[in-house]
Amino acid sequence: MKIFSYLPHNEISRNAAVCKKWRQIAYDTRLWNSVSLRPEVSGLHVYSIEHLMSLISVRFAASLRYIELPMELITHPVLHELANKCPNLTHILLDFSTAMQLHDFNDMQAFPTKLRTMCICLSEVIFMEGFMRKIYNFINGLEVLHLIGTYEKADEEEEEIYEVINVHKLKSATPNLKVVNLYGINFVDDSHIEAFSSNCIQLECLAVNFCAKVTGSSLKILLSRCKKLKCLLMNQCSLQNDQVMAAEWEKSAIQELDITATDLSAESILDLLTRIPSIRWLSAGQLDAFTDSVLKMWGENANLKNLVALDLEMCDNLSEEALYKFIGRFGHNLKGIVLSGIPTVTDSLIANVMPVLKNLRILKMGMPLDCSNRMQSKVHVDQLTDTVANYGKYMERLELSWDNDTLRFSDKSQKGIDTLRVRCPNLKCLVLCDGKYYEIVKANFERADRVTVVRTSKNSTTSNVYLLSHYIELIFN
């Protein structure tokens, strides 16, 4: 049973055909408490509604706590069966993203009532109201809501935008929400944020990443109404400087903030960051206005005693000297720092600041391949790995994504890699650019039976999101 618990469900299903003993184990309901029926995710797909209803009754039953359903399986008989046979179901994902037409929900009379988390992947063209109005009475206990838009699937061509779900009605049915994630939804604007703030006074975390219509005009109302709001993520929103400066940040409980790629001015960034009472997590990447003077003034005028995570990716107007002074002063508390995309960040800076960063768990450095010509010097990776090994005993995630023309290593690199592997036993992920050095490091870790640690920057990346207080609740898909 314990061995089977480590296998994906598609392998468990295949193993059921080996013998009667394995079939008995494979059908044990304890192995099916978390199920994805989206074939592109899990490899599992049920081809008939009748078969799924049989599985819910016999295989899943009271053990089921989490389920993902694709569009073709979201029907009222299936949802009725989940409500009746799965009393412990607390997490559900409903994927409408590929839908061209909804099923008929006129006869739907039941829906799981103990849900704590619900994720809905929206379609670009299917209006959800026919389905949503049938479930409003069953979801008032929701604490975590994900509405996932079509940002990653959108074409570059301008298309007509439809408001496919009525957020204003939805917020009235979910007064107990603590975490709301509106990801990449092309119709979401400040009126929708204001709607959630009017009814969800328990809100602790709001993420509107990649919602380009959000300008910040709702920030003042949001911060005044939601006194428990600690985490606000606005990556690539179209924030306006005057709207951001008008919000009363000094009276808020905000501790975690993402303003990546929001094109704020230096004045607005400084005004915002110095008024937050106590910040612990900041992502301010891709901001041309985040300069040496902003970094210096922020350090002198803000309360940074609790700062544990800082992301300055692609803030290429920062100098090595300014970063050295800032990290030297505040680095002792940092658990995660992202400095990739900054040409002045090389092994020499890390060698100077790493003795201060003794609590560091996440470190990201490097340069995107299409920007590698901006590097002002070569990076001696042997010295870098030796420095990290000596001072980063708590290191969990490390990314050194410089290309092979920028990295310099020697025949003695194996010794430095050995030292890094032995002295950083908690290292879960080491991301490198594909090439000769990557092959050397990967082979070294594989010989030590740590085959999943070393990864290429084509398939993996590192960030500070693991340090968010609501990281687990914010995971979707």
What residues fall within each predicted segment?
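The conserved beta-strand core of Leucine-Rich Repeat
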Residues: 1-477
